[in-house]
């Protein structure tokens, strides 16, 4: 098996762990990192070089692919430059903070013939894949409605993270875009229209950032189907789940009291959300035992992700490495590698943002163009 050389741009909480995981994969080697704050420390740990310039990094003959895990607002340049140098790309979510930037990133990768994989990690949850199979098999009938919630309470922090600044993170809607992507995956595509309401109701003043701490999204899909999504850090009763209602039954993927449930004909079947009961129990323990509610908890450089998160990140990196070694793309993951999932998530998020600030229902065609498809 050939060895694929990977670079990492952004070696904070997520980037460093993705590097550790990729280093363990067969036929994979981390050859260089670029991060002005954390790069040297992680390079020593991963036994690789440190670079300080993107063009120099991507010009290296041993760099075949890059993992981009910079802060959200800094994704575009390293992705575009990688494509221009013929380097394959894995980019963490949210891919961009605007549909225009996301579309440019995807198109540039397509034009230069490089792989572009979106880091929508919920696609690698055992429970999400199982729920999709149940839907495809018609077990719960036609899906009529999805409801997701990802909320909790956040106290004042010692410093204001970039993740709390809307211009840099996009706020809960973009930074926690996993549930939006998951709902669209389960519903089979984007909604036709959206409405978003919300605001900053409990975290105002100089000690806090400027993101909205309560957001409520209503989505209307074709064929008379609907979804409601909630996010925020102003909820003292924390919840984190995706609920799917069909004409014959329902499925709940609960990430707070971690476990999945299928309900059909008055009977319940339980299934794992992650790869093992130990991982599900680990997530439940963390969600109920941290100072900040687990659904809205943020990682920091120097910390390592919990067991359940490490496991799905490992699945994600193993899949990426397999693709770069010639493995065929599975149909269920194809949108992650065609730009479809990346564009669809950001298009819907942009429509929601437009609705919030223009106080009206917004059609997705206003974002992607009339008659356009993702």
Curated annotation (Swiss-Prot):
Cofactor comment: Binds 1 NAD(+) per subunit.
GO MF annotations, alphabetized: lyase activity; nucleotide binding
Phenotype when changing residue 175 to A: Loss of activity
Regulation: Neu5Ac is produced in the presence of NAD(+) or NADH, but not in the presence of FAD.
Residues that, per the record, bind NAD(+): 13-14, 35, 38, 70, 72, 75, 92-93, 162-163
Gene3D superfamilies according to UniProt: Dihydrodipicolinate Reductase, domain 2, NAD(P)-binding Rossmann-like Domain
Keyword terms: Lyase, NAD
Swiss-Prot/TrEMBL catalytic activity: N-acetyl-2,7-anhydro-alpha-neuraminate + H2O = N-acetyl-alpha-neuraminate
InterPro entries (alphabetical): Gfo/Idh/MocA-like_OxRdtase_C (IPR004104), Gfo/Idh/MocA-like_OxRdtase_N (IPR000683), Gfo/Idh/MocA_Oxidoreductases (IPR051450), NAD(P)-bd_dom_sf (IPR036291)
Effect the entry attributes to changing residue 178 to A: Loss of activity
Induction record: Induced in the presence of 2,7-anhydro-Neu5Ac or alpha2-3-sialyllactose (3'SL).
Cofactor annotation: NAD(+)
Coiled-coil region: none
Pfam name, any one: GFO_IDH_MocA_C
Mutant lacking the gene: phenotype: Deletion of the nan cluster abolishes the ability to grow on sialylated substrates. The fitness of the nan mutant is significantly impaired, with a reduced ability to colonize the mucus layer in monocolonized mice.
Enzyme Commission (EC) number: 4.2.1.-
Role description: Hydratase involved in the degradation of sialic acids, which are present in the host mucus layer and represent a much-coveted source of nutrients for R.gnavus, a prevalent member of the normal gut microbiota. Catalyzes the reversible conversion of the dehydrated form of N-acetylneuraminate (Neu5Ac), 2,7-anhydro-N-acetylneuraminate (2,7-AN), to Neu5Ac, allowing growth on 2,7-AN produced by the IT-sialidase NanH. Acts through a multistep mechanism involving a keto intermediate and cycling of NADH/NAD(+).
Subunit structure as annotated in this protein's UniProt entry: Homodimer.
Family: Belongs to the Gfo/Idh/MocA family.
Protein name: 2,7-anhydro-N-acetylneuraminate hydratase
